[in-house]
Amino acid sequence: MVPRLKEKYQTEVVPALMQEFQYRSVMQAPRLEKIVLNIGLGEAIQNSKALDAATSDLAAIAGQKPVITRARKSIAAFKVRQGMPIGVMVTLRGPRMWSFFDRLVNLVLPRLRDFRGVSRRSFDGRGNYSLGLREQIVFPEIDYDKVDKLRGLEVVIVTTAPDDEQGYALLKRLGMPFRD
């Protein structure tokens, strides 16, 4: 079964982008490549249970098992040794990516406190978009009563767009609520 948003992308978004940017081929139109979710855990150094809680939260949000990220270098100021677990991340592609993006745009972002749209300035110059969420409880998959601590997470949306303008056009047409 094709995700709802992917169908919209193929039937509405690609033709609109082809017309706007005068692409010669359908393959030139920018598309979502992957979505990376990351929770950085500074407290994992003292509290190893924090890692398990963050892993289960991210697994519930993403629908697949996250990988534990480890410190590349030792940093004495942060009391971090090389190889210590300092976060969890998951990379979504294919149908899971489309369904997550759909949930993010239509359920999660509107549930944020004082939400007036996401900033246009969070593009990286290569058409990719990054956004941070302050708490994981805005996701409907997370049970509020089982949360031990509020953790933020980063969401990076990687597109094939060559620049920010085309990346913005793609995400805007897919329903991303930008504040203009």
UniProtKB/Swiss-Prot annotation:
GO molecular function: rRNA binding; structural constituent of ribosome; tRNA binding
Keywords tagged on the record: Ribonucleoprotein, Ribosomal protein, RNA-binding, rRNA-binding, tRNA-binding
InterPro entries: Ribosomal_uL5, Ribosomal_uL5_bac-type, Ribosomal_uL5_C, Ribosomal_uL5_CS, Ribosomal_uL5_dom_sf, Ribosomal_uL5_N
GO biological process: translation
Keyword 4Fe-4S found: no
Family statement: Belongs to the universal ribosomal protein uL5 family.
Quaternary state and interactors: Part of the 50S ribosomal subunit; part of the 5S rRNA/L5/L18/L25 subcomplex. Contacts the 5S rRNA and the P site tRNA. Forms a bridge to the 30S subunit in the 70S ribosome.
Task performed by this protein: This is one of the proteins that bind and probably mediate the attachment of the 5S RNA into the large ribosomal subunit, where it forms part of the central protuberance. In the 70S ribosome it contacts protein S13 of the 30S subunit (bridge B1b), connecting the 2 subunits; this bridge is implicated in subunit movement. Contacts the P site tRNA; the 5S rRNA and some of its associated proteins might help stabilize positioning of ribosome-bound tRNAs.
Designated name of the protein: Large ribosomal subunit protein uL5
